[in-house]
């Protein structure tokens, strides 16, 4: 099992949690981004840079992931593709996307997109706070405990 991170939009505090977990649990974490970013020296943490462009990083993640891998993303269409390929997706606020909930979440996202396109001001998500960081860390720990078998 590997962890893939849609890193361009991933909050720094979430990356820090992932870096600590990578070393503690000895799980491979790969950040996929369209620009270079600093990562700590670790045999478990990698950076894969891709060219700029719409969904280039997303497409690379879907191409590289294997069934059972975990993807960290707030991108709901990407999460849906990951699940369709047999992977798992966790957003930076600690919500695990599953086969059971992804379609309704995707439908709500599309509805809100339609609302915004018609001029309705919907606002964006609030900044990630302590409770979201804790929810993310807890969900990540549960997932890794259940699914990762260190070699």
Curated annotation (Swiss-Prot):
Classification via InterPro entries: UPF0178 (IPR003791)
Domain of life: Bacteria
CDD domains: PIN_YqxD-like
HAMAP family per UniProt: UPF0178 (MF_00489)
Family stated for the protein in its record: Belongs to the UPF0178 family.
Protein name: UPF0178 protein Spea_2958
Record organism: Shewanella pealeana (strain ATCC 700345 / ANG-SQ1)
